[in-house]
Amino acid sequence: MPALRKHPQTATKHLFVTGGVVSSLGKGLTASSLGQLLTARGLQVTMQKLDPYLNVDPGTMNPFQHGEVFVTEDGAETDLDVGHYERFLDRNLSGSANVTTGQVYSSVIAKERRGEYLGDTVQVIPHITDEIKSRILAMAEPDAAGVRPDVVITEVGGTVGDIESLPFLEAARQVRHEVGRENCFFLHVSLVPYLAPSGELKTKPTQHSVAALRSIGITPDALILRCDRDVPEPLKNKIALMCDVDVDGVISTPDAPSIYDIPKVLHREELDAYVVRRLNLPFRDVDWTEWDDLLRRVHEPQETVRIALVGKYIDLSDAYLSVAEALRAGGFKHRAKVEMRWVASDDCETEHGAAAALSDVHGVLIPGGFGIRGIEGKIGAISYARKRGLPVLGLCLGLQCIVIEAARSVGITEANSAEFDPKTPDPVISTMADQRDAVAGEADLGGTMRLGAYPAVLTPNSVVAQAYQSTEVSERHRHRFEVNNAYRDRIAKSGLRFSGTSPDGHLVEFVEYDPQIHPFLVGTQAHPELKSRPTRPHPLFAAFIGAAIDYKAAERLPGMDLPEQFVPVEHSDADAPALEEPLEKSDVRG
């Protein structure tokens, strides 16, 4: 009789997170929080998201359907859950952290065309599942620093029972077979609904969801019960019995006040200890030092500031998820609570509309985006804030709108972006040379932007250099358009400074007004929100929230008047020639 195959006890462990009953239960946050707990126990953890949609990546998807696109250091356009992973683990992930059906099928079909399958009939099993498995198992390889992860947490997108998810679930089942059951753990997130008329929590949906999972060969090792309240012990015992799961593996996770409370919720239910025990991982106590400090900043703020996010996609807040979290983290830095006001950019197209939307906020953030809709509203919001000394932070498209507004303020009345008006006589924002084919429709749109981390050099003693405490920085990007260098000198007459560029000096990366002209009006072509962490707020967001706190404090001073340079100044077309005067003689500081 052949000997049983032995699996090495030192092998990287694989933990799969699946979801049942309904979508949007918080699988990504559950996986991220468990990853944070294991990391706090001294383990090396990495994470991956399997998305069952046919798109190659979310880069060309509608923000209203998918939410934000999270860009990694290596330039991959990934699911927003990868942002949760990076923030909770406090580590950078690569493009391999997100796998889609589109990627898998593209790879398999390309291999078939090259003849790599040697004439085999290419099928979902084994070819598609093998491709998925190879990407899952590749996560266990050593990283760039040569460190092999102790645990790979893989979130399977979608809901058990969805036809699109079946190949991924089958691949996960086969991974368990290949690495050994002792090296694999399945965590299933399910809904336990509360029926108000009868006053009952119902377990039947969870039972059916687990039955569907078991029908394809996967028995969960633990269950996350999502509910708006604690699930009592008798119901947990019932679910454990009916779903054939250890009672210790039935975890009640009621809604938490903050997403950063979830690790504490899971720890209170001893999920992390159960996982460590089942996977035979080294047991160390959780080091709560850093996370407890974060939670004190979350729940015991000493100040509150109101920030307006002026955007196009505010009907789905997930479209600006990383921006919102970066703003909150900037608040944590100052022990301040950030109240978000979601302002539709269309509402700020007129001065009256901007005043109605922004008159009682302490800062304005202009996020990235694409297309002409709402652009004049973003420019209107910047103009309103510039004239009143209201702190502004512009990201990507936000920088471009700051530049357009500055150009118009010094008489370049037709200033616009080639993206919004290809025939504008004054394209102060122009198409990047290597992006012209894509913009003209002669090349693929997906995956062709300027993506990933790029360096920038900052002007010494500038606002941004002081925020970063450095003159050399690296930020992630996602854009096709740039500031037109032919207009730099004319735009500079507004007082706007080009305070950061690419190392060769060609590409404008940061703009700002001198603090004597405006206390904090800064734009960056990058997406700094993607590098912010709750425990390590991004310097630009921390500086922005600090400026908002100062603005609020100045508001409270009795009898305070606006400095002269912040008093709104209107220019007629007849004034335009006078705007060529030296800055100190001009009113264009507005």
Curated annotation (Swiss-Prot):
Q: What does this protein do?
A: Catalyzes the ATP-dependent amination of UTP to CTP with either L-glutamine or ammonia as the source of nitrogen. Regulates intracellular CTP levels through interactions with the four ribonucleotide triphosphates.
State a single Gene Ontology molecular function: glutaminase activity
List GO terms (cellular component aspect).
Answer: cytosol
Q: Where is this region: Amidoligase domain?
A: 1-281
Q: Which organism is it from?
A: Mycolicibacterium smegmatis (strain ATCC 700084 / mc(2)155)
Q: Which residues bind UTP?
A: S23, K202, T203, K204, P205, T206, Q207, K238
What does the entry list as the binding residues for ATP? S24, L25, G26, K27, G28, L29, D81
- Which keywords are on file for this protein? ATP-binding, Glutamine amidotransferase, Ligase, Magnesium, Metal-binding, Nucleotide-binding, Pyrimidine biosynthesis
Residues that hold L-glutamine according to the record: G369, L397, G398, L399, Q400, E419, R480
Look at the named UniProt entry and state the broad enzyme category this protein falls under.
ligase
Return the similarity comment. Answer: Belongs to the CTP synthase family.
Pfam families recorded:
CTP_synth_N, GATase
What positions does the entry give for CTP binding? Answer: S23, D162, I163, E164, K202, T203, K204, P205, T206, Q207, K238
- UniProt-listed PANTHER family: CTP SYNTHASE, CTP SYNTHASE-RELATED
Q: Does the keyword Metal-binding apply?
A: yes
Named in its record, the pathway it takes part in is: Pyrimidine metabolism; CTP biosynthesis via de novo pathway; CTP from UDP: step 2/2
According to the entry, every stretch annotated as the Glutamine amidotransferase type-1 domain falls at: 306-554
Catalytic activity, reaction form: UTP + L-glutamine + ATP + H2O = CTP + L-glutamate + ADP + phosphate + 2 H(+); L-glutamine + H2O = L-glutamate + NH4(+); UTP + NH4(+) + ATP = CTP + ADP + phosphate + 2 H(+)
Q: Which PROSITE patterns match?
A: GATASE_TYPE_1 (PS51273)
What is the name listed in the Swiss-Prot or TrEMBL entry for this protein? CTP synthase
Gene name, per UniProt, is pyrG
The protein's Enzyme Commission number:
6.3.4.2
Additional facts recorded: CTPSs have evolved a hybrid strategy for distinguishing between UTP and CTP. The overlapping regions of the product feedback inhibitory and substrate sites recognize a common feature in both compounds, the triphosphate moiety. To differentiate isosteric substrate and product pyrimidine rings, an additional pocket far from the expected kinase/ligase catalytic site, specifically recognizes the cytosine and ribose portions of the product inhibitor.
User: What activity regulation does UniProt give?
Assistant: Allosterically activated by GTP, when glutamine is the substrate; GTP has no effect on the reaction when ammonia is the substrate. The allosteric effector GTP functions by stabilizing the protein conformation that binds the tetrahedral intermediate(s) formed during glutamine hydrolysis. Inhibited by the product CTP, via allosteric rather than competitive inhibition.
Q: Which HAMAP family match?
A: PyrG (MF_01227)
Annotated binding of Mg(2+), by residue = D81, E155
Quaternary structure? Homotetramer.
